Amino acid sequence: MLFASGEQAYVAAQVLDTRFTPDGADPGWADEVVASLGAGERAMCALSFAAGAPGLAHRVVGSEHALQRFEQGPDVDRSYDVTEFPTPDEYAAMVRTALERIATGALHKVVLGRCLDVVSEPPLVPAEIIDRLLTTRPGRYVFSVPLVSGSADGTAPDDGPILVGASPELLVRREGLEISCTPLAGSVPRSADPDEDARRAAGLQESGKDLAEHAFVVEAIVHALKEVCVEIEYPATPELLSTDTVWHLATPIHARLAAGADGPSALRLAQLLHPTPAVGGVPTAAANAVIADLEGDLRDWFAGCVGWVDADGDGEFAVTIRAAVMDGPRLRLFAGAGIVAGSDPASEVRETGAKLATMARVTGLP
């Protein structure tokens, strides 16, 4: 179990207990999690996408150190059975339906996702996937969090589903009174040709559609932060942030807790901000209704958030994108794209395909 940020990783050595909740948005549960922590302990947490959906927190002790790779055995020849759902054509139809609803004025933006199910023989090994994520770094925030309780001896469970990934998106970080967020919204697939790659990056910065999509997210986060923060600062125009497969528009936001050290913990802040329009939409309720209608129960833990909090309330949470759920031989990947007026269904299929490719490569798929 680990959470890596930049070049540092926190690795849990022992799981003391696990607290589940049927509603990851419950602030009382978050307060109980933080209150349960002793000196030197952290809670490694995961929240589902939807309000009223599960959350969990593993109370752990561990250590923080420079990133290092896991020891691996020899390469293993594997066969893969890959299922894409919805299919690209079905996803394009979902986008068209969303655009029709946007045209009525019922909503301004909605994020729609699709999945890959990968079944490998022999089964993939979690440490192998984490090692590849730490090596390739498709996102700054690498994580591995079991979705079941730890073993009786205090170790992480040997079986059961595990949430793994490498997210490029910081939901929130609390360091004392300092609060940071870096929302991403608006993206374009990268190109292997340097000139074309630069052209795409420049085009993204000038895209009215993508800038509008990004503005929805920044406005929502700033509005939420005003409930608990002062001195909120952010640039007038977004920056470019790149992964190995995608260019993103990003806006770094900084603020200070208004209530000082008695302000909300990092876990409470994650609940306050999540889900942002970067994974949901605007207005929130209307977008969530469209997501439930068109996606069904596709998301589960995807497009949620994952991270840690300590006894002082400090911590760091990333948005659960560029992620997979591993369960035995099966690995499910998820990627989404923001749909606004002017979105092109074929372009959104390509964008989600590029995002899925980030995680597909770490499974060993060509």
Regions found by a protein language model. Name each.
Residues 1-52:
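A generic N-terminal leader/anchor concept
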Residues 2-19, 114-212, 216, 227-233, ...:
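An anion-binding catalytic pocket shared by soluble metabolic enzymes
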Residues 6-14, 21-22, 52, 56, ...:
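Contiguous alpha-helical scaffold segments within structured protein domains
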Residues 25-36, 41-42, 94-98, 128, ...:
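Short alpha-helical segments and helix-capping/turn motifs at coil-helix boundaries
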Residues 43-47, 110, 142-145, 300-307:
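A short glycine-rich, hydrophobically flanked beta-strand micro-motif that places a catalytic Asp/Glu
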Residues 105:
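Flexible glycine-rich active-site/ligand-binding loops centered on an Asp-His dyad
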Residues 255-366:
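Conserved hydrophobic core element of enzyme catalytic domains
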